[in-house]
Swiss-Prot record:
Function description: Plays a role in processing non linear or branched viral DNA intermediates in order to promote the production of mature packaged unit-length linear progeny viral DNA molecules. Exhibits endonuclease and exonuclease activities and accepts both double-stranded and single-stranded DNA as substrate. Exonuclease digestion of DNA is in the 5'-> 3' direction and the products are 5'-monophosphate nucleosides. Additionally, forms a recombinase with the major DNA-binding protein, which displays strand exchange activity.
MF-aspect GO terms: DNA binding; endonuclease activity; exonuclease activity
Top-level EC class as recorded in UniProt: hydrolase
UniProt-listed Gene3D superfamilies: 3.90.320.10
Site (Required for function): 177, 213, 236, 238
Name of this protein: Alkaline nuclease
Subcellular location, principal: host cell
Subcellular compartments: Host nucleus; Host cytoplasm
Length: 488
């Protein structure tokens, strides 16, 4: 069975019993055993039941085996060695579905470390992201980073549409993501490229989820489970297709010939809608572009566009601007050396400099970064031996990477692109990166998380007339992220 068939079958299983139907069917029975059940536990049980139903009818392709095995051990009430192969009698799998209330009860009584392990299994089982059918299925009932801005500003929940057809810009971005990740690792972080992670479901609420483009400062234990270390770095990658040009383009050639901030700003302004939005200090930006500056080098000739700030964001926007305007971006300009004998194009760093460019807090990408940092911080807190002693400088941080490429020349089309001994065959040539740190306000992040948890609970109540408890970890997050006063 190929990936498309698996995705289609899994999607049909999810549609047979959506989350709302699952709640209506099971929550009353669950509450007979446990009066107040956190939704994070219910969410794990829903995932388990969805996998049980899928695997019962598709025994030639078992999905989520490790998660099923681990949760069956909770049902049995005993903890056996995880390496033991539990028998997967598919004729019995559907019967296990009826034990959902018992499973919820067992999970509620289980130690936090055991429940957190289940969320790590979910992450491991969804690696590959868009190429993993389980990743798509679990995003359906999750407030992901890409949805956060729309939900927060519109107060509405939109149904996840699953896999869709995308334009050339998105296809190009996906095609070059691996190259950009490699560039960040080699020339910015200067660490080994790590495996991409799966879906990080928020262990506290079960409502939020994040999928990271790149992450450093992590490791994997002997079972392949994620371990988040101190000062982990998260990178959100953006490929700027609208700047993809030939090497002979005047602004591209000038940047390669003399890589300075002046030639770089000229390159940025060469597009009718520059990727960096200029505003005079004290002025509120539009929400069109996710990068902004007060530097007059980036001021365009055309009239600046304005747009109103969403009402719910308006009281916070100036403070968020003040936090982020102090950040500086790093620009790395690349070129390549051709070796016709070995048929290679070796990428090298031609210049690096800082610019007064920062993230626009009115843009959806800022909110995307907030949720990524919030969820990743939950995993860090859960992995920490003494969470109460976590310093604000130790928690994960987020950077947005803006990548510019140029098209291959006719002579370069047959050559392999080489970055740190890794070869790429079809990708275009890296031109520059802008690496921009995001400065979140922990209090604002907590406000957004709490607000959306309440919205989500009310939305479920409207659909099912059920009161669901979406527990958040905003207090733990705030304690970790806010700078602690120095002791005398």
């Amino acid at each position: 069975m190929d990936l498309d068939q698996i995705s289609e079958t899994l999607s049909s299983v999810a549609e047979e019993e959506p989350l709302t139907m699952f709640l209506l069917d099971k929550l009353y029975a669950i509450r007979e055993k446990i009066k107040q059940v956190p939704f994070s536990i219910v969410r794990l049980c829903h995932v388990y039941c969805m996998l049980i139903k899928y695997n019962a009818s598709n025994n030639n392709c078992i999905l989520g085996r490790k998660l099923i095995e681990e949760m069956q051990q909770f049902l049995c009430g005993t903890r056996v060695d995880g390496s033991e192969d539990i028998s997967m009698d598919l004729s019995e799998l559907c019967k296990l579905y009826d034990y959902c209330p018992l499973l919820c009860s067992a999970l509620c009584r289980a130690p936090c470390v055991s429940v957190n392990k289940l969320f790590k299994i979910v992450e491991r089982e969804t690696r590959g992201q868009s190429e993993n059918p389980l990743w798509h299925a679990l995003r359906k009932y999750t407030v992901t980073a890409t949805k956060l801005y729309d939900i927060y500003t519109t107060r509405c929940f939109l149904e996840y549409k699953g896999q869709q057809f995308f334009g050339e810009a998105v296809i190009y971005g996906a095609k070059h993501e691996r190259v950009i990740r490699h560039l960040v690792a080699t020339f910015y972080v200067k660490r080994e490229v790590k495996e991409t992670l799966g879906l990080l479901l928020d262990p506290s609420s079960g409502v939020f989820g994040a999928s990271l483009d790149a992450c450093f400062g992590i490791s994997f234990n002997e079972d392949g489970f994620l371990m988040v270390k101190e000062k982990a770095l998260i990178f959100e990658i953006k490929f700027k297709y609208k700047y993809l040009r030939d090497k002979e383009d005047h602004f591209v050639s000038e940047l390669l010939k003399n890589p300075t901030e002046k030639s770089f700003s000229d390159f940025i302004l060469s597009h009718p809608v520059p990727v960096i939005e200029f505003r005079e200090r004290g002025k509120i930006p539009s929400s069109r572009e996710y990068l902004m500056t007060y530097d007059f080098q980036y001021r365009p000739q055309r009239k600046l566009r304005t747009c109103p700030t969403p009402a719910i964001l308006a009281p916070h926007i100036k403070q968020l601007l003040c936090l982020n305007e102090t950040q500086k971006s790093t620009v790395i300009v690349f070129d390549c050396k051709s070796d016709l004998c070995e048929q290679k194009l070796s990428v090298f760093q031609k210049a690096v400099f800082t610019v007064n460019v920062f993230v626009n807090p009115k843009h959806r990408y800022f909110f995307q970064s907030l949720l990524q940092q919030y969820v990743m911080t939950q995993f860090y807190i859960n992995d920490h031996n003494n969470p109460e002693y976590i310093e604000s400088t130790e928690v994960p941080s987020v950077h947005i990477v803006t990548a510019f490429f140029r098209r291959r020349t006719e002579e370069e089309r047959s050559l392999h692109l080489v970055i740190d001994e890794t070869e790429y065959i079809e990708e275009e040539i890296p031109l520059a990166l802008i690496v921009t740190p995001v400065a979140p306000n922990p209090e604002f992040t907590c406000c957004v998380i709490t607000d959306i948890c309440n919205l989500w609970e009310n939305n479920i109540c409207k659909q099912t007339s059920l009161q669901v408890w979406a527990q958040s970890a905003v207090n733990q997050y705030l304690a970790a992220c806010v700078r602690k006063p120095k002791t005398p």
